[in-house]
């Protein structure tokens, strides 16, 4: 096998800063659930994560995770928010690995919770998408959708009367549907031309475009010719039981949380995602030092016990 070419399945991820800890957790979960292939990671900054030293180097920023999994790091030079950069990096990955057939983008705060064969089969039937947690239902005549249509020219005949709104943290796609990525790039460029802000996410809850997720949904809204294969909120663990993955949405992440502080200050008990994250921190990548792992484990267990007493 040559690292550059011989992969059928490619997982794609982007990170900067401490999100490298999420990439390590995602990697561990992929190995646990029998993924075989390449993990192509785009990173911002000049230094690879320290945990890379645990891996066997191959060549040109390729490292062996296991007999079946290789990870590659590619530096991102763009200044745009990594969310908006998603379709561009996905397209780069398509181009860099022409022999690969199936591609799966994951945000760096997601971990896999189901056998990989389910993902593999899922992509067989169209572009794979998951409903969002908060805005999973948006009417096909919602003002946001009308704003999205205004960003797209020449596809009025392809309007999709969907009521669904999708989370952009995961996307499964095969090479035959690359047109979706091309359209996502095109609509991002149209947004930029209209002076859209792509260096950070807009906090205004009334805006029709606050981040890359809205632009992905704009593409779906104007692409009735692309078959999509949708799972509900349970797919990302937004409703339980979670079926495929767990998505740690929000600013608080399992790797940067003091569970006991969040319980006492905000009344938030450790989530299913928090517990699952800590359970995959040790293999094949040791995400934390022995001391920090022990501290976080004690923090989690003591918070769970205290949470039962507090109700």
Regions found by a protein language model. Give the residues of each.
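A glycosyltransferase accessory/donor-loop signature
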Residues: 1-7, 158-161, 178-311
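N-terminal anchoring/stem segment of glycosyltransferases
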Residues: 1-78, 95-99, 283-311
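Short, polar loop motifs at secondary-structure junctions
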Residues: 43-49, 112-116, 233-235
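A short, glycine-/small-residue-rich helix N-cap motif at loop->alpha-helix starts
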Residues: 78-86
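Residues that flank catalytic or metal-binding motifs in active/ligand-binding sites
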Residues: 86, 106, 166-167, 212, ...
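GT-A fold catalytic core of metal-dependent nucleotide-sugar glycosyltransferases
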Residues: 87-139
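Conserved hydrophobic/aromatic beta-strand scaffold that supports enzyme active sites
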Residues: 89, 170-172, 245
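Conserved catalytic core of nucleotide-sugar-dependent glycosyltransferases
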Residues: 118-187
